[in-house]
Structures are given as C-alpha cells and as structure tokens.
C-alpha cells in the first residue's frame, strides 16, 4: 500500500510523525487544506513534469499550494518547456496515483526539487501517497526526507514574508 511505503521511507530517515488519513478526498489544494485545518498555501503540491533531458523520467517540483509554475523560469532551470505528466504517465513515473503524488519513495530516476515558495513556512503538508492522506513535514527536514536534488525558483504568485 502506498501509505505504508511512504511511512517506511520516512521512518527509515528518522522521521517520527503521523500520517493523516481521511475518509474523504484531499486530492486538491482546497480539499487538503480543509482536511488538515490549514491555509491552502501550506499544502505542498507535488507537481509532475516530463524531464526535458529524458522524457521517460519525471521531474517532481514540491511547491506551495498558492503558486503556479512559470514556463520561463522552468525552462531556464531545466532546459525545456514544462510539460505536465499525462494521466497515464503519473503512476508509472511518480509511483503514485493522481491526487496522491508525493515526493517520497519515488521510482528510480524521478528527480525531486523543492520550490522556494515553501520556504516561507515552518512546515508544509504534502500528500502521503494517496488522494486521502497528508503528512506534516518541517521545511528543515524536507531535503533529507525527499532526497531532493536541490531548491529551485520556478513558481509565481507568492511573495516572501
């Protein structure tokens, strides 16, 4: 099960928090914010793109819930226009279904990046592998827990506080 895979991944890296599971969908930023009781911006959406250098790989960008990816910034950082993964590509390239994509325990080859938009928070809530789960993670722990390749600045619609 996806949640168990996420739990094992996080615990193997020293995390000891709780995965939140819901009776109803938390697949959108608004639904997730309502379920966890926070503002939408603190929902960390994991956006899946085709890697311009290697289309059979995913680039996963963990961004705040109130932002949009800027095509020019993405192209400057990754060398090609952003192309969201198609529905049939999502499970194969991310390891999770649409609505449950998260930056933990992804298939080999998936590249995870953390967007600057989430640094304004002490913690954020990414999905935990299903459309009915979330997990609160401190920003300071995200690089280690995700195995991210680094921080990027590819979004617009927010301002540092």
What are these regions (language model features)?
Residues 1-161:
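Extended, low-hydrophobicity, polar/charged segments
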